[in-house]
Design a protein with these regions (language model features):
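C-terminal, surface-exposed recognition/capping segments
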Residues: 148, 166, 252-425
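Bacterial Sec-dependent N-terminal signal peptides
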Residues: 1-5, 15-44, 422
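N-terminal processing/targeting junctions
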Residues: 11-14, 192
Length: 425
């Protein structure tokens, strides 16, 4: 503020302009703005289903996420399966997570499930519920420690660099269970946690999982005495229950009761058929029960046929198309490291021996951890005599006291829970 001071000098009136500021200092010509409230920062919600829906969504960073909860899987009609009707869930909640705090603030609004991803990696299962609190669908949320990418196999397929649900594609400075991933009964979309240790025994329990309250959620199993409840509807409503085939083992190895058995669940009911050149001709397509994330699917029967020189089963390590890990110029069991590194078109990919759930007892076989590796394909396998309910294994290997073998075309009971290595659609 300027003031005019009057002073008489030699009888003359002088007007002197002076400036006044705080503490007699020169003022800032621009006045300080009035204090205000900072605007609320906009919360960016990542729509995980923006490029398509699936039963599994990958997240690679923390923050708010959402996905369409009205569509079952990819919502597609495939051979043997009609397109599913859309859902109208009443609520949503976390079922389990492998790392506490990985998923919080699960909400449902206008057919969209939203949640916040914490700063811990892991796997989780989120479910949508009906008004009577029954699970009507569930989704696997996968937060790996490294980026998911593909490598071209010698068969031409673009193969995911890690198991479905794995944290890493290879071991770090020392072997650990991070590459093991999750395990699936053939045809089911919901995963089960694998072994918590590289090796185990009959008493080994799966990796612990936790509910929204932090309490441990138990992975249970169905009755051994009956398969009457073993239906698709029951499996969807009970995503934490491994379904046993014990009561029908001699006639069907399916987790579904034999009368409900369905070859089309993973989108390739005729995938086991071969032509006159002995090649698999039906590749199938992704079904709405497929457990793989957007853009990926469970692989067809011929994906890993180059993993052995025979294209099938062999006990001769020199016939395994694997990396010579110790560099001695010989392929043998010394190149095995809780799994095999199979050669691809360029480079290699590691396939760990992530154990399995036995389909009869519907429990983890921890004694096979680090010794047996089995990987599902999307097609059924042929019956053995009068026994039905087999699924196609695109890769099965073992290494232990019982011997060493690799098979690129195997089969097993659908009630067994095995690894899945997805391929690009």
């Amino acid at each position: 503020m300027k003031k005019n001071l009057r002073r008489f000098v030699g009888g003359t009136l002088l007007l002197i302009a002076t400036a006044c500021g705080k503490n007699n200092t020169d003022p800032d010509p621009t006045p300080d703005p009035e204090p205000g409230v900072d605007p609320t920062p906009e919360i960016v919600v990542r729509d995980l289903s923006a490029n398509g829906t699936s039963n599994c969504y990958i997240i690679l960073q923390t923050g708010a996420c959402s996905f369409d909860a009205t569509v079952k899987g990819n919502g597609a009609a495939t051979e043997g399966l009609d397109a599913p009707e859309k859902m109208s869930p009443d609520s949503a909640a976390l079922v389990w997570e492998t790392s506490k705090g990985m998923i919080t603030d699960v909400k449902l609004k206008d057919g969209t499930i939203s949640f916040k991803a914490g700063d811990v990696n892991g796997n989780a299962l989120i479910a949508a519920y009906s008004a009577d609190k029954r699970v009507i669908w569930s989704w696997h949320i996968w937060f790996p420690e490294e980026n998911v990418k593909t490598v071209t196999a010698k068969s031409g397929y673009e193969v995911m660099n890690m198991n479905l649900g794995a944290m890493t594609s290879t071991f770090g400075s020392a072997p650990d269970v991070k590459p093991y991933g999750l395990l699936y009964q053939w045809g089911r979309k919901d995963p089960f946690p694998s072994a918590p240790s590289l090796t185990g025994n009959e008493k080994t329990q799966p990796v612990p999982v936790y509910g929204p309250d932090g309490a441990e959620v138990k992975i249970t199993y169905s009755l051994w005495s009956s398969v009457e409840n073993n239906t698709i509807e029951y499996s969807i409503a009970n995503p934490t229950k491994c379904l046993s085939n014990y009561a029908q083992y001699n006639t069907s190895r399916d987790w579904l009761k034999a009368s409900d058995s369905n070859d089309a669940l993973w989108g390739n009911p005729k995938g086991g058929e071969r032509n006159s050149d002995n090649n698999y001709v039906n590749k199938g397509s992704k079904s709405f029960y497929d457990p793989c994330p957007v853009g990926y699917r469970v692989p067809p029967a011929d994906v890993f046929r180059t993993f052995t020189t025979t294209g099938g089963y062999t006990q001769d390590p020199s016939s395994f198309d694997v990396v010579d890990l110790n560099g001695d110029g010989v392929i043998d069991t010394r190149d095995y490291n809780y799994g095999w590194s199979f050669n691809m078109k360029e480079g290699s990919l590691f396939f760990p021996a992530a154990a399995r759930y036995d389909g009869s007892y519907a429990m983890l076989m921890g004694s096979k951890s680090g010794l047996w590796g089995s990987y599902w394909g999307n097609s059924p396998a042929k019956s053995y005599g009068a026994t039905t309910g087999f699924g196609f294994c695109v890769l099965a290997f073992m290494n232990g006291a019982a011997g060493t073998s690799v098979s690129a075309t195997a089969s097993a009971g659908r009630a067994d829970a095995y690894s899945v290595r997805c391929v690009k659609e």
